[in-house]
From Swiss-Prot:
This is ATP synthase subunit a, chloroplastic. GO terms for cellular component: chloroplast thylakoid membrane; plasma membrane; proton-transporting ATP synthase complex. Keywords: ATP synthesis, CF(0), Chloroplast, Hydrogen ion transport, Ion transport, Membrane, Plastid, Thylakoid, Transmembrane, Transmembrane helix, Transport. SUPFAM superfamilies: F1F0 ATP synthase subunit A (SSF81336). The keyword Nucleus does not apply. The gene is atpI. It is a multi-pass membrane protein. Belongs to the ATPase A chain family. F-type ATPases have 2 components, CF(1) - the catalytic core - and CF(0) - the membrane proton channel. CF(1) has five subunits: alpha(3), beta(3), gamma(1), delta(1), epsilon(1). CF(0) has four main subunits: a, b, b' and c. InterPro entries: ATP_syn_F0_a_bact/chloroplast (IPR045082), ATP_synth_F0_asu (IPR000568), ATP_synth_F0_asu_AS (IPR023011), F0_ATP_A_sf (IPR035908). PROSITE patterns: ATPASE_A. Key component of the proton channel; it plays a direct role in the translocation of protons across the membrane. It comes from Helianthus annuus. CDD domains: ATP-synt_Fo_a_6.
Length: 247
């Protein structure tokens, strides 16, 4: 009961935290909802980059791949390896989901360092990487949660919920709490790392605007790629865990 009360208090605290804003934001009204316009703009740019790259890669496929086709086939093989390692032999249907997560986060993270967002002026706020906004990372984490629940229910039916009393019913509250901590850890890890990286670069550029920030930017690109890989790997691991039923 204490664990349940703690979970409710944690959710209430997160709801209150969602009302806290850092800096200024450019809002749009869509269907009665207020959304962050700059996040939608940058997300659409990232999606356009991914769709455009995919269209170019499959425009004229060759039996012996060269150039861009070779690169994209390597990326696909890499995503397949990650999915197979974490999910197992039934990884096939989940490759598109894991690949979409990885590529969207990867390009979003890199866009914060490589695209000149600052030159686009908004009435309020400024453009930045989509993953620099907690709303984006929480949405990605919730999609992952829906995916592993769907995977478990599809594979096992209602018997999937038996995992909550394994290995002993005493662990029921902890096993339930785990389903809240997974999306929290995914979202805050990604958001915190990307936000910290962009803040460090901004501070260094303002202090020493010539040479010093360049190594930090390269380090940021490396860590951004690692964060995308970590997110995709954990998403695949959670899906595999729900299908196998072990911790």
């Amino acid at each position: 009961m204490n664990v349940l009360s703690c979970s409710i208090n944690t959710l209430n605290g997160l709801y209150d935290l969602s009302g806290v804003e850092v800096g200024q934001h450019f809002y749009w009204k869509i269907g009665g909802f207020q959304v962050h316009g700059q996040v939608l703009i940058t997300s659409w740019v990232v999606i356009a980059i991914l769709l455009g790259s995919a269209a170019l890669a499959v425009r004229n496929p060759q039996t012996i791949p060269t150039g861009g086709q070779n690169f994209f086939e390597y990326v696909l093989e890499f995503i397949r390896d990650v999915s197979k390692t974490q999910i197992g032999e039934e990884y096939g249907p989940w490759v598109p989901f894991i690949g979409t997560m990885f590529l969207f986060i990867f390009v979003s993270n890199w866009s914060g360092a490589l695209l000149p967002w600052k030159i686009i002026q908004l009435p309020h706020g400024e453009l930045a990487a989509p993953t620099n906004d907690i709303n984006t990372t929480v949405a990605l984490a919730l999609l992952t949660s829906v995916a592993y629940f769907y995977a478990g229910l599809t594979k096992k039916g209602l018997s999937y919920f038996g995992k909550y009393i394994q290995p002993t019913p005493i662990l029921l509250p902890i096993n339930i709490l785990e389903d809240f901590t997974k999306p929290l850890s995914l979202s805050f890890r990604l958001f915190g790392n990307i936000l910290a990286d962009e803040l460090v670069v901004v501070v260094l550029v303002s202090l020493v605007p010539s040479v010093v920030p360049i190594p930090v930017m390269f380090l940021g690109l490396f860590t951004s790629g690692i964060q995308a890989l970590i997110f995709a790997t954990l998403a695949a691991a959670y899906i595999g865990e729900s299908m196998e039923g072990h911790h």
